């Protein structure tokens, strides 16, 4: 009976063990800038992974992009095996054809033990027409 109780306790604790060890995602960037960024084409996204433990490294990531106004997910990379965390291209995203749309994105990463982090906070970018970001006030 004691063995059965320990076994059940172990099974209940398993989901807690699968979480990555105190990994946090910070400094979300779009074209190497933080905050709401205006982009004319496919944005390149980035982030910084932080962990209090030495030797922790990113082995994979997943990016999700949603429309800010509806919350509808318009692009998700799925789990991508990569240690890259800067200037990640979104050139495969077919949603990026609507000018003046605000998009929200977030990311999560996997560590060397294949445990996922929590999703990052959300960051924004806005798609603008070609040449708009270099426009000047004529008044």
Language-model features, listed with the residues they occupy:
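Position-driven detector of the extreme protein N-terminus
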Residues: 2-3, 15
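Sec-dependent signal peptide recognition
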Residues: 3-10
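Hydrophobic h-region of N-terminal signal peptides that target proteins for export
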Residues: 10-19
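Pro/Thr/Ser/Gly-rich low-complexity, intrinsically disordered linker/stalk tracts
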Residues: 21-53, 126-133
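Residue-level recognition of well-ordered beta-strand positions that form the cores
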Residues: 46-48, 64, 108
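Recognizes extended acidic, P/S/T-rich segments that occur
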Residues: 56-102, 112-119, 135-139
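Terminal edge beta-strands and adjacent linker/stalk segments
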Residues: 120-124
């Amino acid at each position: 009976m004691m063995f059965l109780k320990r076994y059940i306790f172990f099974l209940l604790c398993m989901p807690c063990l699968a979480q990555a060890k105190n990994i946090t995602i910070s400094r979300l960037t779009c074209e190497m800038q933080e905050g709401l960024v205006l982009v004319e084409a496919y944005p390149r996204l980035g982030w910084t992974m932080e962990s209090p433990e030495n030797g922790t490294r990113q082995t994979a990531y997943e990016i999700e992009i949603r429309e800010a106004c509806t919350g509808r997910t318009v692009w998700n990379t799925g789990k991508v095996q990569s240690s890259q965390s800067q200037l990640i291209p979104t050139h495969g995203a077919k949603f990026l054809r609507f000018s003046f749309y605000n998009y929200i994105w977030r990311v999560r990463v996997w560590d060397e033990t294949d445990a996922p982090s929590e999703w990052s906070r959300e960051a924004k970018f806005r798609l603008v027409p070609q040449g708009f970001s270099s426009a000047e006030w004529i008044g």
